[in-house]
Amino acid sequence: TMQRILGEHAFDGKNVTVIGYGPVGQGFARRIRALGAEVTICDIDPVASLKAVFDGFAAQDIDEALPCADMVVSATGVRHTVTLEHMRAMHEGAALAVIGGIANEIALDEVSDFTPQVNRDTVQLNVPDGPTLTLIADGDGVNYTVGGGNPIEIMDLSFAVQASAVAYLLEHRGTLDHTLIDRKSVV
């Protein structure tokens, strides 16, 4: 989706900082590295940062990585992962996005004159006392706001598994131990 928005060669030789090295951040980092990006990982968990290094990525503190980043992508699902001070540290014209995510993963509520734009893939974000950034999908999750989201077949499967789990819990209410369930006994 981001490649569609920013262009076919959006990641070629770009310095991309990915904040969060959970499953979403890992998948995105691998994908954009394959598309030619130089990827730096920022994660407050030292084990996740070490995993990123073992996976061949640079790992830095967010304050060190942001000034050099052509693009910053938050993949944490944590409110205010990218603060107003972080935005001020970015360079003019850098792109800023969220993948997955929640409302205000980028602290846009601290940018006084920011107004979300309907049906806009990108918008110029004038950071108070800072640079103008290219904000993708109004700071909402790119994959579900400007992209097609998850395929319906995947959503059907996900909801079916969730419904099966709820049915199992209801059927066995009061009789379940507080242990892990063997997959074979559920099927």
Please tell me what each predicted stretch does.
Residues 31-35, 88-91, 112-114, 150-153:
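Short, solvent-exposed amphipathic alpha-helical segments in soluble enzyme
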Residues 22, 44-45, 102:
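Residues in the short beta-alpha loop(s) of Rossmann-like NAD(P)-binding domains
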Residues 8-9, 36-39, 60, 90-93:
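Secondary-structure transition/capping motifs at alpha-helix termini
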Residues 49, 55-131:
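Rossmann-like adenosine-cofactor binding region
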Residues 33-55:
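NAD(P)-binding Rossmann-fold cofactor-contacting core
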Residues 2, 7-33, 40:
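Glycine-rich adenosine-cofactor-binding loop
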Residues 1-8, 108-187:
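Adenosine-phosphate binding glycine-rich loop
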